[in-house]
């Protein structure tokens, strides 16, 4: 059987993995096998969390919009319902940015949404006759 000489390739592979695992704690940054295992886990977490980040930002935008809406005497779901009824097409990201940076413009959007809602929906819960 022919002898396989791959010392250079093996060292390069190990060096690449150890270089990528530089910030890990303990053996995970020094021993090849531990570093390789940790690198696989790290890449899995990164892949998962890139997708989770989108939902987390949406939650943040909704929280900001809801807080600003309640300051203007309307709830988040009524605000969104009113904006859709009025034909205002602004996404939650931009709506949250407006709520944080430009209160006057957000108040104007709230008034548009309130005007587009049916009258019985404008009444606080429990008082609609």
Swiss-Prot record:
UniProt xrefs under Pfam families: Ribosomal_L20
Keywords: Ribonucleoprotein, Ribosomal protein, RNA-binding, rRNA-binding
InterPro entries tied to this protein: Ribosomal_bL20, RIBOSOMAL_L20_CS, Ribosomal_protein_bL20_C
Matching CDD domains: Ribosomal_L20
GO biological process: ribosomal large subunit assembly; translation
Entry-linked NCBIfam families: rplT_bact (TIGR01032)
Family the UniProt entry places it in: Belongs to the bacterial ribosomal protein bL20 family.
Functional note: Binds directly to 23S ribosomal RNA and is necessary for the in vitro assembly process of the 50S ribosomal subunit. It is not involved in the protein synthesizing functions of that subunit.
Protein's name in the database: Large ribosomal subunit protein bL20
Organism: Mycobacterium sp. (strain KMS)
Name of the gene: rplT
């Amino acid at each position: 059987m022919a002898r396989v000489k791959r010392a250079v390739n093996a060292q390069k592979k190990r060096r690449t993995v150890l270089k990528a695992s530089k910030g890990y704690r303990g053996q995970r940054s020094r021993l090849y096998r531990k570093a390789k295992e940790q690198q696989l886990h790290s890449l899995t977490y990164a892949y998962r969390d890139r997708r989770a980040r989108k939902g987390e930002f949406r939650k943040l935008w909704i929280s900001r919009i809801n807080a600003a809406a309640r300051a203007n005497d309307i709830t988040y779901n009524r605000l969104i319902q009113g904006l859709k009824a009025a034909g205002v097409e602004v996404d939650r990201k931009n709506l949250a940015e407006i709520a944080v940076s430009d209160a006057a413009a957000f108040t104007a959007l709230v008034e548009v949404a309130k005007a587009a809602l049916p009258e019985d929906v404008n009444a606080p819960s429990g008082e609609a006759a």
